[in-house]
């Protein structure tokens, strides 16, 4: 189950939105759809399009395994998803 954003943790909603925005920008630059980002290059679905949408819009906090998957699909180091945030 995806981790919901906790508004009681100072800065968490803003941080989650920034990470989601960064992933969306990289996804669009790469020319991938949300469904393609959530799947492997061979089409095996790891993360549903709805999860990707919720993550990109800051409604859910991505797990470490989700971040690792997205970084791999976007051909960027995992640290690039968080750099400067």
Predicted features along the sequence, with ranges:
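A short, Lys/Arg-rich alpha-helix, primarily the initiator
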Residues: 2-29
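Residue-level signal for the short linker/turn that defines the boundary of a DNA-recognition helix
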Residues: 18-21, 31-32, 47, 62-65
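Generic structural marker for isolated residues within well-ordered, non-membrane alpha-helices
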Residues: 23, 34, 38, 67
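Short alpha-helical DNA-recognition segment
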Residues: 30-54
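DNA major-groove recognition helix of helix-turn-helix
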Residues: 41, 56, 66, 82
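DNA major-groove recognition helix of helix-turn-helix/homeodomain DNA-binding modules
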Residues: 63-80
